[in-house]
């Protein structure tokens, strides 16, 4: 996240995640799927709804060179793993640590199904590192 989605929203960096894990504190990430940043919108036009971020918001919050590179790697790995990028994005959060419990807010059957499919994806440490760092 480049800038907060809304005032008071914060992002959890690696240092803070390490602190939480070492102190056995659970993390409940709010925007675990980056509000659709990992969906190829032109392939799913019928699932676009009013709660989706505007392009302006998406650019402000998520578009950076690092994030766009991560998105590209997510699409590449999703193809190799035969899943969708949005499923892989959630699987990434789930697979990071057993103390992370991502919150999701599906608004239609497509979103619900993608969340359930993410539970089937077991990522290796190498795949997690690839998604984060390349």
Where are these regions (language model features)?
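Beta/alpha (TIM)-barrel catalytic core signal, keyed to glycine-rich beta->alpha loops juxtaposed to Asp/Glu
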Residues: 1-133
């Amino acid at each position: 996240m480049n800038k907060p989605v809304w005032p008071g929203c914060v992002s959890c960096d690696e240092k803070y995640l390490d602190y939480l894990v070492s102190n056995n504190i659970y993390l409940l990430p709010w925007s675990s799927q980056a509000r659709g940043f990992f969906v190829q919108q032109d392939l799913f036009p019928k699932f676009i709804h009013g709660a989706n971020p505007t392009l302006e918001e998406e650019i402000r919050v998520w578009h950076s060179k690092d994030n766009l590179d991560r998105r590209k790697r997510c699409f590449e790995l999703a193809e190799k793993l035969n899943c969708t990028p949005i499923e892989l994005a959630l699987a990434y959060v789930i697979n990071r640590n057993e103390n992370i419990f991502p919150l999701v807010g599906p608004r239609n059957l497509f979103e619900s199904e993608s969340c359930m499919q993410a539970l089937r994806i077991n990522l290796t440490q190498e795949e997690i590192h690839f998604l984060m760092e390349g």
